């Protein structure tokens, strides 16, 4: 579960290293984001000489959470970290590579481009 003020790792090569969630997008006043949800975040740590700088406000999709994701067959999927991929307004990733595994549920959330770039889909 990602809420406001939560820190996330960045799972792509867009230039950011750490994000802080400042808003969870969706209907109503949502408090938490799960895998596949879009958040508004601020870049807290960035790689020098890249196109994303510190204190930039970006949109990101959550790809990994430490809280378990329960599937219909009863399996619970837990990751070691909270991570997100930075996306543009159309929902395409801004980076060209994605690091680490992502959940299969992203394909159902219309993030097929993110799933296709991922090295491992669980």
UniProtKB/Swiss-Prot annotation:
UniProt xrefs under SMART domains: Ribosomal_L14
Alphabetical UniProt keywords: Chloroplast, Plastid, Ribonucleoprotein, Ribosomal protein, RNA-binding, rRNA-binding
Localization annotation: Plastid, Chloroplast
GO CC annotations, alphabetized: chloroplast; cytosolic large ribosomal subunit
Domain of life: Eukaryota
PROSITE patterns reported for this sequence: RIBOSOMAL_L14 (PS00049)
GO BP terms: translation
Any one GO molecular-function label of the UniProt entry: large ribosomal subunit rRNA binding
Principal location listed in the UniProt entry: plastid
Subunit structure as annotated in this protein's UniProt entry: Part of the 50S ribosomal subunit.
Cross-referenced HAMAP family: Ribosomal_uL14
Function: Binds to 23S rRNA.
Similarity-based family: Belongs to the universal ribosomal protein uL14 family.
Name listed for the protein in its UniProt record: Large ribosomal subunit protein uL14c
Species of the source: Adiantum capillus-veneris (Maidenhair fern)
Lineage: Eukaryota, Viridiplantae, Streptophyta, Embryophyta, Tracheophyta
């Amino acid at each position: 579960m990602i809420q406001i003020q939560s820190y996330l790792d960045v799972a792509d090569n867009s230039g950011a290293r750490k994000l802080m969630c400042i808003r969870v997008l969706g209907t109503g006043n949502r408090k938490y984001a799960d895998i596949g949800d879009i958040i508004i975040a601020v870049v807290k740590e960035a790689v020098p000489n890249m196109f994303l700088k510190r204190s930039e406000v970006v949109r990101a999709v959550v790809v990994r959470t430490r809280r378990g994701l329960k599937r219909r067959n009863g399996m619970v999927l837990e990751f070691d970290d909270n991570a997100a991929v930075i996306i543009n307004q159309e929902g395409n990733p801004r980076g060209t590579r994605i690091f680490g595994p992502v959940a299969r549920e992203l394909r159902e959330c219309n993030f097929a481009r993110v799933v296709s770039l991922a090295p491992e889909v669980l």
